Amino acid sequence: SRETLSIINEKGGEAILFKADLTKSDEVQKLKAFCVEKCGCSLDILINNSGGLIARKKLAEQDEAFYDSVMDLNFKSLFLVSNAFVGMIPSGGAVVNLSSLAARDGGGGGSSLYAASKGAITTYTRSLAKELGPDGIRVNSVCPGLINTTFHDIFTPDEARKRVAESTPLRREGTSEDVANLVYFLASDNAAFITGANYDINGGLAFS
């Protein structure tokens, strides 16, 4: 995050950092208060980008605590942030949620709860698009496939990554820049008539 902050500032932008546990309501409220103090009461774009796999576990290996940790990290955090900040978004604003290809196809081995939590995000995106549309607020999500990030560095074996990348029409993994460009588009006025959409970005690995 500090590296990203430096890049933004070096390119003439202005960015700030605030550390918070987005699975806890009181922490989200502290984040909101910080944003109001630093940036005022208006928020044109909200990008919900928290989440993670935590671990690959089959059903027999999962317990209630693991269920709660995965759902809290991926879906509860998105709910709490959206709930806290939606009142600050004016007409013409946009929300972009980070879902996953796993929401479409159930994910890889040991990721059933992760896939379910991301599936909740795709449905929630559609619901919020209907609810917030009359207020002029658009809500969309992106569903990345195999992206070259620390997520797969940690949880996906190199051989499996190579096999999957070679099976895509574009014959490569995606990059964080690929995903960021799509998020930028959906947040911009170029997507002014798009809402409730869950955009695949996976190099043709899967179609929906």
Model region roles, listed by residue range:
Residues 87, 130-134, 192:
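Alpha-helical segment proximal to the catalytic Tyr-Lys
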